[in-house]
Every structure is written in C-alpha cells, then in structure tokens.
Amino acid sequence: MADPTSKDDHDGEGGRDKSSTFVQKLIDVEEAKTQIIYSLPMIFTNLFYYCIPLTSVMFASQLGQLELAGATLANSWATVTGFAFMTGLSGALETLCGQGFGAKSYRMLGIHLQSSCIVSLVFTILITILWFFTESVFLLLRQDPSISKQAALYMKYLAPGLLAYGFLQNILRFCQTQCIVTPLVLFSFLPLVINIGTTYALVHLAGLGFIGAPIATSISLWIAFVSLGFYVICSDKFKETWTGFSMESFHHVVLNLTLSIPSAAMVCLEYWAFEILVFLAGLMRNPEITTSLVAICVNTESISYMLTCGLSAATSTRVSNELGAGNVKGAKKATSVSVKLSLVLALGVVIAILVGHDAWVGLFSNSHVIKEGFASLRFFLAASITLDSIQGVLSGVARGCGWQRLATVINLGTFYLIGMPISVLCGFKLKLHAKGLWIGLICGMFCQSASLLLMTIFRKWTKLTAATV
C-alpha cells in the first residue's frame, strides 16, 4: 500500500526546490553569504573606531555650553579636514593590495602598505599645520570668537592622533583586502573601551578638564595603531604579505599618489557636501530649528552609512581580488550581488526610519516643532539613504577597479554642479527651507548613483599591470 504522505512530501520538496531556484535566480546565495560574513565585522570595526573621538566629545560636552560648542565644532572640522581625508588616502590600498592579493603577488602587499604610510605621513604634516591655524580660519568664517578659541585648543591636542589614525586606516585596508576581518573587531573594541576610561581619568580625575578629552583620543588612536601593527608583524597569517620594512616602498609612492589623492577627494567631496548643508541651514530664517533638523538628518544619514561602509568594503575586496586573479566575470557577479544587498540593507533602514521616526528624533530633541519637522522630512531622508546605500557599494567597485579619478569627477559634478545649486534654489528661492536643501541633496545623489552605475556597466574591467601589483 502506498504511503499517503508521500505525495505531500514530494509536493513540499518540490515547493522548496522552486523557492530555492527562485532565490538562486534572484541572487547568488553563496556570494551573498560571503559578502555578509565579511561585511558584519567591518561594520562593527568602523563603528567602534568612529566612536573613539565621539566619546571624547561627549565627555568634553559635559563641562559646559562653551565646551560643548567648541568640542563639537572641533570634531566636525577634524573630520572633514583630517580623518575623512586619511580614510580616503587609504583607499589606494583597496586597489593595489586587493588586486595584488588576487594575483598572488603577496610580497607587494607589504610594500604598498609602507608606501601608503609614507604618503599618510606627508599629508599629516600638511594637515597639522592647517590645524594649528584653526582659530584664524574659524574667525575668517565668522564663527564666535570664544567658541573658535575653544575649538582651536581642542584641535591642538587632537593633532598627535591624526598620524596614528592615518597609519591605522592603512593597516585596516591591508587586512581587509586579505579577507582577515574578524580580529579587527577586537582590535577596534579594546581601544574604544580604553578611550572611555582614559577620557574620564584625564578630564575628571587628573584635573585636565577640557584638554583631557582630545589627549585621550590621541592616546587611544596610538594604542589602536600600535596594537594592530604588532598583530600584523607577529601573526603567521601575514607571513607572506608582510616581509619586513623595505626601501623599495619609496619607489611606489608616486603610483600610490595617483590612486590615493583621487580616493581622498572622492570621500571628502561627499563629506563636505553634508557639512555645507548644515552651514546653509544656519543662514535661513529660524536657523536654530532649520539647523537642528538638517543636523539630525545628516547624523542619521551618517549612522546609516556605517552599515553601507561594511558592504562597500566587502564589494571593493571581492572585486579587486577577482580582477587581480583575472576573473572579470567573477568581479561583475560580486558587484551584482552587492548592489542587490545594498537595496535590502537600505530597505531595512528606511522601514525603521518611517516606522520609528518619532522615537528616533526623540534621542536628539524633545521639541514638538523639531519632531514635526523631522516627520515631514522622513520620506526625503528615506530616498537619500537608499541612494547613499547604492552609491556606497558602487564607490567600492570603483576603488576595487582603480577608477578613483573618474569617480572623483562624478562626485564633484553631481554634488557641486547639480545638488548644491538645486539646494540653494529650493531652500532659499522657493522657500522650502530644510526640505529644499534635502531635495537638492537627493538630486545630486541620484545623478551620482546613476553616473556610477553607468560607469560600472560600460567601462572596461581590467586589472592593473603586473608591475604594479
């Protein structure tokens, strides 16, 4: 007698097979798993390092209104002129080390790391000189004199940490391109914990007050760099890619510059666009409300981008590794999966914002006016977060392929020739205020994402020459 459940079991298995086939057609599951497993540690790593200077600002902010304004202004200035630039410079290694690892030119990874550190050292000196004129620059920009003086004091003691941050970013890219990412979570979390304790000790126990916060940040960044550096030197995982210091690294500085400067420009042009929006908001009627709304939106976008950064790093590594191995088809497949994952990621964040916007804005302000204003902006913010997620992944493709120069031109044109003029027109001329500013940003981001997508589709995919990787 036949088993009466056999047909049901067969139908159930057939249904599962159909479902599995549909998912496989929609997205390469194995590639998606690889990228997700890789992205998660990078998300936490980026978040922990991001929180080191932020926690110091929080401690300084507790000392008074002047200290709050000075520390916040200093941190913003340090980010757009220093930390973001250093992060961008390290993007050269995503191309050089990523493709070198794929091509099995393992020794060259250590050489490129040293070249990148030389470049970081030179630019750190130049940026530090700029930082020592912070007060004059702020006064030139018509900032409050007392706040400018306080911010300049903060920058003075933050400057020693910039070099450590630059070196740290280079080592992160060096590890990232070899798919060694899980240990990075521990090496980023420990300095954050140390920074919290050090900041409290210097600000409150040692009696250093305001300057204790930036000193703690500098100390913590050096601890982060030295600890990760020792890990690379001592671990057997890097025995083929780190063979010691070499004078050969100086021969590759020019090559590094051809990629690192456009990569830094890519990052900074986008960072600066958001800062300009906050500045424009301060020029409007009711600047306290408009600035607060735009600042909350910018902070929300930045936090959301932390998630995209992890996926962008995974995309860059997968693309550069495949190109280095001569597998263009594999690189394109990785890109396709990354773009789909970016849409899923954006959808999750957007749903959270649309559903929980009231609770979210409550973390920043209890004002009913601010809450109502943010509610009216939430759909615009959802659009920009979606576009930012897509462009973040496509920018990762550009870094993996070595297309930084073209991507820089795209960012310059879309943000400053399209986005900003529309922001000014809608915000001031059409009197849409904060909405108008964000509409301009969305227009710029849409053009940016579309341009990067067209570049990805139509540009020829080739690896760098064997001599460079």
Swiss-Prot record:
Alphabetically ordered keywords of this record: Membrane, Transmembrane, Transmembrane helix, Transport
A GO molecular function held by the record: antiporter activity
Membrane topology recorded in Swiss-Prot or TrEMBL: Multi-pass membrane protein
GO biological process: defense response to oomycetes; defense response to other organism; xenobiotic detoxification by transmembrane export across the plasma membrane
Coiled-coil spans in chain: none
InterPro entries: MATE_euk, MATE_fam
Family, as annotated: Belongs to the multi antimicrobial extrusion (MATE) (TC 2.A.66.1) family.
Name of the protein in its database record: Protein DETOXIFICATION 18
Originating organism: Arabidopsis thaliana (Mouse-ear cress)
